[in-house]
From Swiss-Prot:
The keyword Cell membrane applies. SUPFAM superfamilies: N-terminal domain of the delta subunit of the F1F0-ATP synthase (SSF47928). This is ATP synthase subunit delta. F-type ATPases have 2 components, F(1) - the catalytic core - and F(0) - the membrane proton channel. F(1) has five subunits: alpha(3), beta(3), gamma(1), delta(1), epsilon(1). F(0) has three main subunits: a(1), b(2) and c(10-14). The alpha and beta chains form an alternating ring which encloses part of the gamma chain. F(1) is attached to F(0) by a central stalk formed by the gamma and epsilon chains, while a peripheral stalk is formed by the delta and b chains. One of its GO terms (cellular component) is proton-transporting ATP synthase complex. It holds the Pfam family OSCP. It is found in: Cell membrane. It is a peripheral membrane protein. The gene is atpH. F(1)F(0) ATP synthase produces ATP from ADP in the presence of a proton or sodium gradient. F-type ATPases consist of two structural domains, F(1) containing the extramembraneous catalytic core and F(0) containing the membrane proton channel, linked together by a central stalk and a peripheral stalk. During catalysis, ATP synthesis in the catalytic domain of F(1) is coupled via a rotary mechanism of the central stalk subunits to proton translocation. The lineage of its organism: Bacteria, Bacillati, Bacillota, Bacilli, Lactobacillales. It comes from Streptococcus pyogenes serotype M2 (strain MGAS10270). Belongs to the ATPase delta chain family. GO terms for molecular function: proton-transporting ATP synthase activity, rotational mechanism.
């Protein structure tokens, strides 16, 4: 992707987030974006929209199906994308919208990797640790299970990581022995 395309994607995303923020509807926008991104993942819609073999009329039909969202701003955004023939960039724009919402609201997705599934009490403690250590509000809690950690956990928020896994401690111990 070129710098020009990246700048275009960021401009569309920032504009949508600004409008939603001014009208205090970031939560509704975030829900719409997550639902549409889920549709992209389950249907490979991104390939259809970016394909030159698919006629523009078909792309319009595909995006019209997404307009059932509750947000007026999302529907207007989709209309603008169709009008300017930017369908190929929609997936990246929506990803960027989520990043912009996180920045504006200081609410980031938290990825927790542990050797066993977390209990509800552990999830609430993770949210408290994230709020204290990273000074952010925890958004969605994305839980991953990786038995190779042996024990402990890895918390990742906004490109920052806390790694208390036994696997990492064993690796550090091994490096110290060399």
């Amino acid at each position: 992707m070129t710098k020009k395309e990246q700048a275009l994607i960021e401009q569309y995303a920032k504009s949508l987030v600004e409008v939603a923020s001014e009208h205090h509807s970031l939560d509704a926008l975030q829900a719409d974006v997550l639902a549409i991104l889920e549709t992209f993942v389950t249907t490979n819609l991104d390939q259809s929209l970016s394909s030159l073999a698919v006629p523009h009329a078909e792309k319009i039909k595909l995006l019209t199906l997404l307009k059932g969202s509750n947000s007026v701003y999302m529907n207007n955004f989709l209309n603008l994308i169709l009008q300017n023939e930017r369908e190929a960039y929609l997936y990246q724009m929506l990803q960027t919208v989520l990043n912009e919402i996180a920045i504006v609201s200081n609410q980031y997705d938290v990825t927790v990797t542990s050797s066993l599934p977390l209990t509800e009490e552990q999830k609430s403690r993770v949210r408290a640790v994230v709020a204290k250590k990273f000074a952010v509000t925890a958004g969605r809690l994305i839980e991953k299970v990786d038995p190779s950690l042996i024990g402990g956990f890895i918390i990742s928020v906004n490109n920052k990581v806390i790694d208390t896994s036994i696997r990492r401690q064993l690796q550090a111990f091994k490096m110290n022995l060399k």
